[in-house]
């Protein structure tokens, strides 16, 4: 007879048994990578996308993203992303005060993942808008496609590795992390 699975909402956890800052730090890098893969995957639908244009966009957005990390810019970027996509983006503060069970911790982690992804997408879209790297119509198309790709990833119809492989095959572009920092490498043409 198989053992019955324990409900995670009934598994009590001690307040000091988890480090919320470490959880957030670990997932931020993953979600920034995911956001970039979604955006670059969406850009692949445009005929004018080239390795050089991807590298130029990457360079401009990263230079600008270093400047706009305060909450005012993030709020402005979230409003812009909502305007161009019609997607409502939750931006509530996360609290660890309600975490009493394993289920609560799982819920906190899910919300932190979503929030980190939305902030990363908003930061990228805000930089694109501020620097006018894409016209608003193309920006809207790119981010709607990025959200659609994210839905496909959630539904396991495609994977982030599929997007990464497509970028490598079609554009010789490789995304990776080093010590929590995102890197873009364009492989030289043979």
Enumerate the language-model features and the residues they cover.
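A structural feature that tracks compact, well-ordered secondary-structure segments
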Residues: 129-130, 139-144
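Intrinsic disorder/low-complexity detector
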Residues: 3-42, 70-130, 160-190
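Amphipathic alpha-helical segments that form the core helices of the histone-fold
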Residues: 57-68, 142-153
């Amino acid at each position: 007879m198989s053992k019955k699975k324990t409900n995670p909402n009934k598994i009590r956890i001690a307040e000091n048994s988890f480090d919320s800052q470490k959880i957030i730090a670990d997932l931020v890098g993953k979600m920034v990578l995911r956001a970039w893969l979604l955006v670059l995957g969406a850009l692949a639908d445009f005929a004018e996308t080239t390795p050089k244009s991807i590298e130029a966009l990457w360079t401009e957005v990263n230079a600008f993203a270093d400047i706009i990390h305060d909450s005012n810019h993030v709020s402005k970027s979230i409003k812009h992303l909502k305007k161009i996509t019609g997607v409502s983006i939750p931006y509530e503060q996360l609290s660890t005060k309600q975490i009493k069970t394993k289920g609560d911790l799982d819920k906190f982690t899910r919300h932190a993942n979503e929030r980190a992804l939305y902030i990363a997408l908003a930061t990228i879209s805000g930089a694109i808008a501020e620097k006018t790297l894409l016209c608003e119509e193309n920006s809207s198309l790119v981010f709607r496609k990025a959200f659609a790709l994210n839905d496909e990833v959630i539904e396991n119809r495609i994977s982030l590795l599929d997007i990464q492989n497509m970028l490598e095959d079609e554009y010789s572009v490789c995304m990776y992390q080093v010590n929590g920092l995102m890197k873009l490498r364009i492989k030289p043409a043979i």
